[in-house]
């Protein structure tokens, strides 16, 4: 799956997967900037760019979408 992928892209893939988990948690109110730094990104703008390239949405758009879906599923 990752053959021919650069190391930084490989690592960023897993960073974004972790970000998706955290942003999908309705109980989490972590700021995007805090999340970016906790995942090892040097800035929130770099994190947002990488996140959008992986998911098609900014972190804030993703969080809003995940919260909306969670509310829809919970009644």
Name the predicted role of every residue range.
Residues 44-45, 60:
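Key DNA-contact positions within bacterial/archaeal DNA-binding proteins
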Residues 2-42, 65-75:
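Terminal helix-turn-helix DNA-binding modules in bacterial transcription factors
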Residues 52, 56, 60, 64-67:
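A short, amphipathic alpha-helical segment
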């Amino acid at each position: 799956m990752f053959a021919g992928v650069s190391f930084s892209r490989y690592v960023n893939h897993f960073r974004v997967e972790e970000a998706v988990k955290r942003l999908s948690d309705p109980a989490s109110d972590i700021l995007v900037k805090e999340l970016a730094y906790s995942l090892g990104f040097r800035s929130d703008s770099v994190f947002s760019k990488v996140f959008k390239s992986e998911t098609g949405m900014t972190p804030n758009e993703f969080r809003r979408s995940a919260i909306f879906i969670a509310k829809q599923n919970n009644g």
